[in-house]
């Protein structure tokens, strides 16, 4: 059997498939998206974890030992900042968040040599812009940041203890140079 987990904006879904690809079981659990200020969209990563555990338990119910593989999908845009202990420093800033609109103008004003390798359309909820916003508006939190993850990559860390991403998710952060297949500091150094 194979387990699929999708970390959505307001809920997590778990799906158990048999070896023949047919659905054996499915479960979903909701979690809150808070908007402490108009235009902000945040969720505490601990909520994702708690509801993922519940959804997986409900879906696998006594069949966990039969699971041969796990696939993750979910929010690629968004920002989870971790401290030295690899724990979140604040609620995650989600893809729908609009607080970094001023940072969009700043990015678009950068020299093409910095902007073009990022190879993406720009939206306020992208991790690079949210990180710029954090640097300006929550400097103590920003100073404590040791790792930056997408929501889905944070869930992978919670499940496995491993920090990882893949190029398609990394490219959506505005912190990744697609042509060089590596992290770009241009936006944060500008």
Q: Which residues fall in each region the model found?
A:
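N-terminal glycine/serine-rich phosphate-binding loop of ATP-dependent small-molecule kinases
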Residues: 1-90, 144
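Glycine-rich phosphate-binding/catalytic subdomain of phosphoryl-transfer
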Residues: 57-190
């Amino acid at each position: 059997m194979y387990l699929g987990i999708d970390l959505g904006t307001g809920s997590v879904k778990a799906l158990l498939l048999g070896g023949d690809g047919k659905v054996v079981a499915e479960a979903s659990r909701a979690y809150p998206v808070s908007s402490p200020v108009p235009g902000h969209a945040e969720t505490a990563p601990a909520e994702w974890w708690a509801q993922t555990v519940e959804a997986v338990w409900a879906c696998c119910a006594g069949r966990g030992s039969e699971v041969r593989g796990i696939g993750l999908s979910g929010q690629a845009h968004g920002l989870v900042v971790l401290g030295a202990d690899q724990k979140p420093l604040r609620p995650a800033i989600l893809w729908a968040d609009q607080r970094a609109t001023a940072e969009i103008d700043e990015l678009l004003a950068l020299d093409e040599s910095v902007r073009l390798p990022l190879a993406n359309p720009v939206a306020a909820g992208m991790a690079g812009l949210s990180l710029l916003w954090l640097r300006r508006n929550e400097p103590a939190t920003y100073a404590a940041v040791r790792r930056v993850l997408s929501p889905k990559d944070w869930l992978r860390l919670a499940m496995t203890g491993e920090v990882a991403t893949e190029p398609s998710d990394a490219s959506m952060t505005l912190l990744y140079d697609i042509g060089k297949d590596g992290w770009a500091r241009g936006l944060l150094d500008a």
